[in-house]
Amino acid sequence: MSKEKVNTRRKVVDVEKLETAKAGFANGISTYLKDLIEKGEHRSLTDKEKLKIISKAEKAYGKFLTALGVDWENDPNSMETPRRVAKAYVNDLWRGRYEIPTEITAFPSDGYNGIILERDIPITSMCSHHHQAILGKVHIAYIPGTDGKVVGLSKLNRIVEHFGRRGSIQEQLTVAIHNAISTIAETEN
């Protein structure tokens, strides 16, 4: 089969259609990313842009620690804590808020209408109510629709990773993952 024919059979999903929350909400993209998209720039934030956010968050977290009575400026164990926490949020814990998800390519199911199951997908997220870690495993099962698509197993992992790295409550995270897979695979729910 020629490459052209393969590409015409693929379905590449518009990642913006996968958004489940308003920008700036705990389980949505950041207001920074929203502003880029509104300007027509469909890209993730650059390292330089992230450094500006880290700098602002670092100052705010220092004030937060001071409000809690932590003398972080003089405690050798806490001196760098505001910067470390800010970097952890932007570059790891909430990186899904600052990044456009990678394109997910789905392929025709070619009449396959059985269940597709991926178990034990590791997830690290953060509860948006209490900012506590959510650690666990996700199990995904779906049945492609009549004219549905099949999503590669590694793509299911990417979907979980992307939405997990935003911060959310577990119920909203479940809905976001479900909606993404239903949209991409064109399931009949």
Per-segment meaning from a language model:
Residues 2-189:
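A domain-level signal for the structural core that forms small-molecule/cofactor-binding pockets
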